């Protein structure tokens, strides 16, 4: 399990804008996935959720998942903090800063939720404040 000290340390390592992204996104846990939507409290697709959460920190991301992490914003996983973007082909997620935990809108029929990353080598990490 996760200890409170691990979660607090992850939270403390993130700046206020990253913290705002994470808090904003967490308000949508349980909201249904729906392709090409960004409707708080109603439905999101993966890139709609990341775009909406980052807009609340004053950063505008591209609408499509494949364009949300740019070459300028890409970071090594060791530098990733809570609120950073995670991308795999066709899917964008928000890193929780703890172990391999992410928040995302998973797929049709799914709900916005917290999940564990599997096959970490398939994922790229990005800090939108750098791009």
Regions found by a protein language model. Name each.
Residues 1-32, 99, 120-131:
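Intrinsically disordered, low-complexity
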Residues 31-82:
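Catalytic cysteine-centered active-site loop
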Residues 66-75, 96-131:
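Aromatic- and glycine-rich peptidoglycan recognition patches
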Residues 92-93:
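A conserved glycine-rich beta-strand in the N-terminal activation segment of trypsin-fold
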